[in-house]
Amino acid sequence: MSGQGKRLMVMAGGTGGHVFPGLAVAHHLMAQGWQVRWLGTADRMEADLVPKHGIEIDFIRISGLRGKGIKALIAAPLRIFNAWRQARAIMKAYKPDVVLGMGGYVSGPGGLAAWSLGIPVVLHEQNGIAGLTNKWLAKIATKVMQAFPGAFPNAEVVGNPVRTDVLALPLPQQRLAGREGPVRVLVVGGSQGARILNQTMPQVAAKLGDSVTIWHQSGKGSQQSVEQAYAEAGQPQHKVTEFIDDMAAAYAWADVVVCRSGALTVSEIAAAGLPALFVPFQHKDRQQYWNALPLEKAGAAKIIEQPQLSVDAVANTLAGWSRETLLTMAERARAASIPDATERVANEVSRVARA
């Protein structure tokens, strides 16, 4: 499907969960001849990341309102109006055929600006429960898509765009059948780490002994303390790294993952075809719980919510999964994934632009 001469503006910012899926769709459409620009904020990760991908970025000034106090709330309408005006000027100059909102604060004023100029708005909600910005924008959007069922009552479920190196991994049957020895447990806390996993997993390792080998991603600044915790638990052999640059290689190595359940993490684990023990971050709206629930329902994962998390709960869960069980769960995870999510989102953008 050629997009020769068509123009897209992607609105996404703040976290990797918004920015990476946006980049996947942008690259897919650029390969079809689309011109793509980005709308973001200058003080968040998109400011550095997007230009590295060869995409020009425009900035508006906007930030979140949660927990900002009464003064910020009083000033909010003026700040939103100014951000809307900035976005409108940017879009008037660029003249996109369609805008794609992938979440983050920037999508709110950006979506309103597009709508006020008669530019179609396409939305993609990455999480199992819709964010505030997308709830508002859904009322004016031409098309709304969701990664998981339940964020919006009638939106099409298209999955989350996932990195191509994860999609290219061999299927679970090819990867896991015939594996022997200790079960390989990948612990992922995200770039900031997950303190609860850093505290719990060394004790889990002590309980499980030689039956597991662990690769633990501790997050920024925590590697030494986590290594020390494993050593003090009599388990110094396990590997601890601050970050994992090649997640596809880590997924290929693993038999099972213990992690938070951010939207992109859940989608990557499903695409990789891996069983998981999810410990959702305690958001007020239980966003990460709803992200993980479809995989638990599919028999591919177990959720332990943080108040119920203990060394015994994790150790008993992992010890209760035989290699046969892990392979079955891995196959169910892969079956529940939507590997062509990038194409599905890109196709809707193209369809709306042609309408």
Curated annotation (Swiss-Prot):
The molecular function terms in GO held by this entry are: UDP-N-acetyl-D-glucosamine:N-acetylmuramoyl-L-alanyl-D-glutamyl-meso-2,6-diaminopimelyl-D-alanyl-D-alanine-diphosphoundecaprenol 4-beta-N-acetylglucosaminlytransferase activity; undecaprenyldiphospho-muramoylpentapeptide beta-N-acetylglucosaminyltransferase activity
Gene Ontology CC terms, in alphabetical order: plasma membrane
Give the reaction(s) catalysed.
di-trans,octa-cis-undecaprenyl diphospho-N-acetyl-alpha-D-muramoyl-L-alanyl-D-glutamyl-meso-2,6-diaminopimeloyl-D-alanyl-D-alanine + UDP-N-acetyl-alpha-D-glucosamine = di-trans,octa-cis-undecaprenyl diphospho-[N-acetyl-alpha-D-glucosaminyl-(1->4)]-N-acetyl-alpha-D-muramoyl-L-alanyl-D-glutamyl-meso-2,6-diaminopimeloyl-D-alanyl-D-alanine + UDP + H(+)
Keyword Membrane tagged:
yes
Give the EC number(s) listed in the UniProt record.
2.4.1.227
Q: How does it sit in the membrane?
A: Peripheral membrane protein
Q: What is the documented disruption phenotype for this protein?
A: Inactivation of the gene rapidly inhibits peptidoglycan synthesis in exponentially growing cells.
Q: Which CDD domains match?
A: GT28_MurG
Q: Which UniProt keywords apply?
A: Cell cycle, Cell division, Cell inner membrane, Cell membrane, Cell shape, Cell wall biogenesis/degradation, Glycosyltransferase, Membrane, Peptidoglycan synthesis, Transferase
Looking up SUPFAM superfamilies in the UniProt record yields:
UDP-Glycosyltransferase/glycogen phosphorylase (SSF53756)
Q: What does this protein do?
A: Cell wall formation. Catalyzes the transfer of a GlcNAc subunit on undecaprenyl-pyrophosphoryl-MurNAc-pentapeptide (lipid intermediate I) to form undecaprenyl-pyrophosphoryl-MurNAc-(pentapeptide)GlcNAc (lipid intermediate II). Strongly prefers UDP to CDP, GDP, ADP and TDP.
Q: Which family does it belong to?
A: Belongs to the glycosyltransferase 28 family. MurG subfamily.
The molecule here is called: UDP-N-acetylglucosamine--N-acetylmuramyl-(pentapeptide) pyrophosphoryl-undecaprenol N-acetylglucosamine transferase
Which organism is the protein's source?
Answer: Escherichia coli (strain K12)
Gene it is expressed from:
murG
